[in-house]
Amino acid sequence: MVGLNSLLEQTGSITLPTGEIIERHPDTVVVVTTNISYEGCRRINQSFIDRMSLVKDVELPSPEIMIQRAMSVTGATDEILVSQMVQVVNDISIYCRQNSITDGSCGMRSLIDWILSTEITEDIYQSALSTVISKATADETDREALISAVLEPIFSKKRRKKA
């Protein structure tokens, strides 16, 4: 992204390898997003960040918003069940942060995948294993810890119910 720095300056132009100079349109708006904690992603270069007018870190939305969004996207109707699923997703995210488990992710996409999988399988526990736990970490020991510390206190192995 550092190669774009000259476009973000006041003069807003970049010279292509062909020698052609491209001028930035005066109404240009640049939006940059990244997940720096994801494997393969790097931190954004400070010189690039310095050229931004506004920098905002975005965390997971509140549980209420997560419930609303997940139900809207999936068509799920059981708000109590979805709220329990949101609690598990948030608790997994917290557990991973507190225990330095950084090789996976757990957020809205995992939640939505879990709800949709549960609709198909009618097995909330097994669906959690293949949509939430499996994405949170590849380490088998950490997965077992997530299952016993976070998943099973809310959803026992035998529980089967649609979202």
Enumerate the predicted regions with their spans.
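C-terminal regulatory/interaction module of P-loop NTP-utilizing enzymes
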Residues: 1-163
